[in-house]
C-alpha cells in the first residue's frame, strides 16, 4: 500500500470516517489544495473512494471532502 493511501486510511479511521470500498489514485486531481475550509495550503496527492469522497494528502496531513462538499 502506498504511503499516501495509508495516511488517508489512517486519518479516516482516526476521525471515524468510513472509507467506501477501494481507494483509487487520481493524479489528474493532484495540486495545491487551499482554502480555510480544507486546512491545507500545499501540494496534495488525491485519492478517491467508491463513494466519491476525495482524500487530499500532504505529508502526514489529510483532508477529506465528500461529494456534497463537506470537509472532514
Feature-to-residue mapping (PLM):
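Short intrinsically disordered terminal tails
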Residues: 1-6, 68-72
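Short, non-transmembrane alpha-helical segments in secretory-pathway proteins
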Residues: 2-22
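Acidic, low-complexity, intrinsically disordered interaction modules
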Residues: 20-72
Amino acid at each position: 500500500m502506498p504511503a499516501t493511501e495509508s495516511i488517508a486510511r489512517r486519518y479516516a479511521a482516526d476521525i471515524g470516517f468510513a472509507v467506501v470500498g477501494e481507494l483509487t489514485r487520481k493524479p489528474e486531481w493532484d495540486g495545491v489544495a487551499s482554502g480555510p475550509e480544507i486546512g491545507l495550503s500545499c501540494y496534495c496527492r488525491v485519492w478517491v473512494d467508491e463513494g466519491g469522497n476525495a482524500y487530499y494528502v500532504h505529508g502526514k496531513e489529510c483532508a477529506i471532502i465528500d461529494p456534497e462538499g463537506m470537509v472532514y
